């Protein structure tokens, strides 16, 4: 917006009692003392943390491995595992890559990042760390 436009909007809004104020003055007015007393101090909304609670990775123990079916247009079987995280929570994690040797009681490193076609799966197992080996090269 240009300066002449702002000045024109200001003069017209002042002459008409702020009825046609530009967006510059469209914010809400200040709260009254009664409203501030009733509502109390402003509360910061809590930060929305993902399943790793703000950490980049978490260590976990595999409870069981299983296969999940993806959502509608896709048809492959996705390898997943149930993991007890170091925070004490249990979560379902996707195992990326072809072929894995994960079994019960294996220790894995888990990172955030959802699998788009698996509803409710928001974590991935990191390959090549702890008991989860690297993806093997095809021969």
Curated annotation (Swiss-Prot):
Residues 1-29 form a transit peptide. This is Small ribosomal subunit protein uS12m. GO terms for biological process: mitochondrial translation. Belongs to the universal ribosomal protein uS12 family. It holds the Pfam family Ribosom_S12_S23. One of its GO terms (cellular component) is mitochondrion. InterPro entries: NA-bd_OB-fold (IPR012340), Ribosomal_uS12 (IPR006032), Ribosomal_uS12_bac (IPR005679). Its main location: mitochondrion. SUPFAM superfamilies: Nucleic acid-binding proteins. Component of the mitochondrial ribosome small subunit (28S) which comprises a 12S rRNA and about 30 distinct proteins. PANTHER family: 30S RIBOSOMAL PROTEIN S12 FAMILY MEMBER (PTHR11652). The lineage of its organism: Eukaryota, Metazoa, Chordata, Craniata, Vertebrata. It is found in: Mitochondrion. The keyword Ribosomal protein applies. GO terms for molecular function: structural constituent of ribosome. Keywords: Mitochondrion, Ribonucleoprotein, Ribosomal protein, Transit peptide. It comes from the Eukaryota. NCBIfam families: rpsL_bact. The keyword Mitochondrion applies.
